[in-house]
Design a protein with these regions (language model features):
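Composition-driven recognition of glycine/serine/threonine/acidic- and proline-rich low-complexity segments
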Residues: 1-138
Length: 138
């Protein structure tokens, strides 16, 4: 089984079935503070099948095995993961770094066993990388 953020699936074959689950009231709280989607879709292949995921902004998709080492991800970078991967909200210990460091106060910690697929450039990072190249209209 693969779980992914709502809207991340691009296409799938007939043998793959989708289940949508919400995190309940606790999930709504986590979604509100972490910036991740309230709904996760689970995909299960009843027979051999294929599924493809896509991103909503420019960048790359990076596969990471979190079995040996947990990973802290910025909001909106989690695309999909194996069902064995746990996702939890992570609070920055240094409040100043969260507010002024561009990392955000709340992130997502991903622990294994299993693999996750991450979007490498959240829209905020894209905007920050393009800002110096934009000429101000004076």
């Amino acid at each position: 089984m693969i779980k992914c953020q709502s809207g991340a699936m691009a296409w799938m074959t007939r043998s793959v079935k989708m289940q949508t689950k919400s995190g309940g009231l606790g999930g709504m709280f986590k979604e509100a503070i972490s910036g991740e989607s309230l709904f996760l879709n689970n995909y299960i292949a009843e027979l051999p099948g294929e599924i493809a995921f896509g991103m909503s902004f420019p960048g790359h998709i990076l596969a990471v095995d979190v079995s040996q080492m947990p990973l802290i991800a910025q909001k909106k970078t989690f695309l999909a993961g194996e069902s064995t991967v746990n996702m939890e909200v992570f609070l920055q210990k240094k409040i100043g770094a969260g507010f002024f460091g561009g990392e955000g106060l709340f992130n997502t910690i991903l622990t294994g066993p299993g693999r996750v697929w991450l979007q490498t450039m959240p829209i905020s990072a894209l905007a920050n990388s393009l800002a110096p190249l934009i000429v101000a209209n004076k």
